[in-house]
């Protein structure tokens, strides 16, 4: 070995060699970091898709389960769709609707409050729990205030604490919801005592008078099982207000997170009156996001229109928990187009009414297009609509 080579070896690496080694090391670290980052991004995307699938399925299962029971105990033509006077000491309120431009609170299987400009709807579904279904009796004497409802028959199926609704038989005027405080005898006729402050619903007198022999009293079952449910989406969370979910009926309890939209449509049976017989089955002839004059009586949102609702079409949109990174141009392409629902013709031959959604979440600084979404749709027949008395 020459003396020059030996001297170079003893001197160690040159500056150029050290710099080349550092560059190679940095490139290796950068490559490994990029691999780990891409792997983590893929993992988050996969987990986010799984989360949105689970959240969406749970949300749809919960809402559709309510829809299957909607209208139980409310399917009598005298009661279904009646504008109802209602107060609750725990704060629950009936859904507001319009009847030819006048505000009402109808008691029906389902009431949709449409969200403006593609924003989420509010879907309310009502159901009683009386074991006998539509338990009813007739008011015998005029009710002009007070806490006694004298009836014309023994109160079979009624119990203290049951929720009742008093309705005019001619369908004119409002109904009133109350709660049974006692079952008593008044002379030769049995009577229902109401207006007891120990009970939750309408602790005072009814807010209107009712004519004897021309008004019915319907039993909706016990207070604990009264299923008045309002579904809504707020701040990217599916929430539920309910009469049978804790002591606070006004509170909207969280059910599923990363739910950004809830949409619903009525499925109306539009057959002529001569052909309309719910006991022989209901059929959807028209979908609508808002209430219409389905029975052609000249009144939009009347009781007859709610009695023409054969099914509900429901859509839920779930969002991935983690947004994806924008492209080199700063634009996200995870969801490049607006989300639309209800675009397919179901049942066959019925024109769809497609709806474009606004899935933006209030106060979320991330562009909505940076998230991935899953849409869930279903149609739920209101089976209780066909199981109604005709006399």
Give the residues covered by each predicted segment.
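Structural signal for terminal/edge beta-strands and the immediately following C-terminal loop/tail
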Residues: 375-391
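Intrinsically disordered, low-complexity regions enriched in serine, threonine, proline
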Residues: 1, 5-6, 96
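Aliphatic-rich helix starts adjacent to a transmembrane/signal segment
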Residues: 3-5, 11-64, 68-70, 391
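N-terminal pilin/flagellin-like segments and related low-complexity appendage regions
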Residues: 59-315, 321-372, 388-391
């Amino acid at each position: 070995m020459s003396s020059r080579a030996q001297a170079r070896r003893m001197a160690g690496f040159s500056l150029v060699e050290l710099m080349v080694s550092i560059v190679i090391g940095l490139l290796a670290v950068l490559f490994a970091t990029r691999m780990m980052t891409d792997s983590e991004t893929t993992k988050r995307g996969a987990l986010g898709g799984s989360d949105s699938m689970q959240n969406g399925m749970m949300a749809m299962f919960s809402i559709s389960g309510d829809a299957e029971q909607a209208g139980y105990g409310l399917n009598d033509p005298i009661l279904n769709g009646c504008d109802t006077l209602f107060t609750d000491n725990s704060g629950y309120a009936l859904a507001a609707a319009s009847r030819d431009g006048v505000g009402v609170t109808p008691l029906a299987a389902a009431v949709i409050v449409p969200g403006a400009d593609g924003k989420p709807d509010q879907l309310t579904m009502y159901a009683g729990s009386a074991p006998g279904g539509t338990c009813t009796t007739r008011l015998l004497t005029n009710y002009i205030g007070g806490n006694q409802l004298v009836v014309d028959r023994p109160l079979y199926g009624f119990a203290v604490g049951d929720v009742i609704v008093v309705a005019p038989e001619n369908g004119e005027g409002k109904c009133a919801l109350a709660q049974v405080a006692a079952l008593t005898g008044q002379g030769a006729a049995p009577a229902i005592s109401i207006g007891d402050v120990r009970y939750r619903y309408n602790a005072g007198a009814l807010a209107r008078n009712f004519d004897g022999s021309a008004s019915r009293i319907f039993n909706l079952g016990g207070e604990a099982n009264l299923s008045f449910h309002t579904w809504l989406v707020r701040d990217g969370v599916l929430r539920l207000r309910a009469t049978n979910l804790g002591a606070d009926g006004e509170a909207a309890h969280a059910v599923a997170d990363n739910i950004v939209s809830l949409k619903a449509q009525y499925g109306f049976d539009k057959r002529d009156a001569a052909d309309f017989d719910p006991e022989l089955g209901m059929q959807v002839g028209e979908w609508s996001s808002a209430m219409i004059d389905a029975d052609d009586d000249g009144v939009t949102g009347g009781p007859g229109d709610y009695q023409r609702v054969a099914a509900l079409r429901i859509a839920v949109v779930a969002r991935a928990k983690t947004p994806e990174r924008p492209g080199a141009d700063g634009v996200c392409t995870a969801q490049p187009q607006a989300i639309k629902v209800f675009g397919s013709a179901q049942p066959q031959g019925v024109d769809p009414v497609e709806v474009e959604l606004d899935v933006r979440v209030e106060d979320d600084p991330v562009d909505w297009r940076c998230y991935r979404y899953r849409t869930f749709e279903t149609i739920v027949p209101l089976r209780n609509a066909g199981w109604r008395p005709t006399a």
